[in-house]
Amino acid sequence: MKKGVVKEYDSSKGFGFITGDNKEDYFVHVSGLREHLKQRGLRAGQTVSFDVEIGMRGDKAINVKIG
């Protein structure tokens, strides 16, 4: 798992971006959050752990959890 910080997240739209420890930005969609976070969403500045899914539009954060 990678570590990073939530750069921005719009709960009303269900997506945002995480900046990884490697300074790369990863798109995150509500579908990539662990179940307990789907209702709550994410907040800018939160430290998170995540896996990366390589997609046609770029890398995407999945299995996102706090910590």
Where do the PLM segments sit?
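Beta-strand secondary-structure signal
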Residues: K3, S49-D51
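Short nucleic-acid-contacting surface segments enriched for D/E, G, S/T with interspersed K/R
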Residues: H36-S49
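Beta-strand/loop nucleic-acid-binding surfaces
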Residues: D25-K38
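Structural detector for short beta-strands of small beta-barrel domains
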Residues: M1-S12
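Short aromatic-glycine-enriched beta-strand elements
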Residues: K13-I18
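OB-fold/S1-family single-stranded nucleic acid-binding modules
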Residues: E53-G67
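A generic beta-sheet turn/junction motif
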Residues: D10, D21, I54-M56
